């Protein structure tokens, strides 16, 4: 731990540096700290020895090191009031009637990326925490049909598919009966397991040839096991990081996995400063916030940017965005009221 005065100096240097991105000298600190310039320089030298400050190559000033930013986040970061113009911009962005969950989450991701000039990823409820609560097949013609799947009693999804050759209407009815009996009410982890174990054996009782039926099950259910993730500001990564990070952000399933790995089940928020095991994010900061999705669970909101970002503003922004999302999603699910299908 550092002394109270050293902590005050470190916090002030970080505040000034994140505003100007210029090295900070002792004279710039004197107006806020009641002590001599020599004492401030001495304390700055001690902070440098501790690895919390770094010398600038082009001036006599100091700038925070990655360790300094990390210390600040762990010991001094608090939620300040958000700028009124930021609050207005966040609230104004959601002044629209939403007809799909995806529209709300994609909008939140884009708004934050535009306001911060960094990258933002928003994750829906983790697939393994969702349940299959309803299933139906609607035959559209002699050649195609529509599978309607409902998750958590409030997230309908549809999958249109070509009816396999030699299939009769009663075969589609049998598939629905099998799903209702074996998969309905199960969480998606159980559904995935049963599709690999029980279902192939059951199909042998009712179908002479099962390969195309298994392929149909795979096609209908495969997207349920994928993370639902909305990423904005990918191109911004070329400015604050580089090509490796930009390419990594395009691998959205891996990105979702990395974000979840950085947050434990019991945490509501985390700030990782140069602390990711993923090489493309190792020298960056990730601010992740868990927000409520009414009736279903929690989603994750993650801001990815440089180590020298303005933590006070950005942490406050994602905190406010999380609250706005919870309100908007509550209104959305009240409207949905389990009476509407989402058609992709």
Curated annotation (Swiss-Prot):
Q: Which Gene3D superfamilies match?
A: 3.30.450.40, Heat-inducible transcription repressor hrca homolog, domain 3 (3.30.390.60), Winged helix-like DNA-binding domain superfamily/Winged helix DNA-binding domain (1.10.10.10)
Matching entries from InterPro entries are given as: GAF-like_dom_sf (IPR029016), HrcA (IPR002571), HrcA_C (IPR021153), WH-like_DNA-bd_sf (IPR036388), WH_DNA-bd_sf (IPR036390), WHTH_HrcA_DNA-bd (IPR005104), WHTH_transcript_rep_HrcA_IDD (IPR023120)
Keyword Repressor appears in the UniProt entry: yes
What is one Gene Ontology biological process annotated in the Swiss-Prot or TrEMBL record?
A: negative regulation of DNA-templated transcription
* Molecular function in Gene Ontology: DNA binding
The residue range of the signal peptide is: none
Entry keyword set: Repressor, Stress response, Transcription, Transcription regulation
Q: Answer whether the UniProt record assigns the keyword Transcription to this protein.
A: yes
* Functional note: Negative regulator of class I heat shock genes (grpE-dnaK-dnaJ and groELS operons). Prevents heat-shock induction of these operons.
State the family named in the UniProt similarity comment for this chain: Belongs to the HrcA family.
Q: What is this protein called?
A: Heat-inducible transcription repressor HrcA
Q: Which organism is it from?
A: Streptococcus uberis (strain ATCC BAA-854 / 0140J)
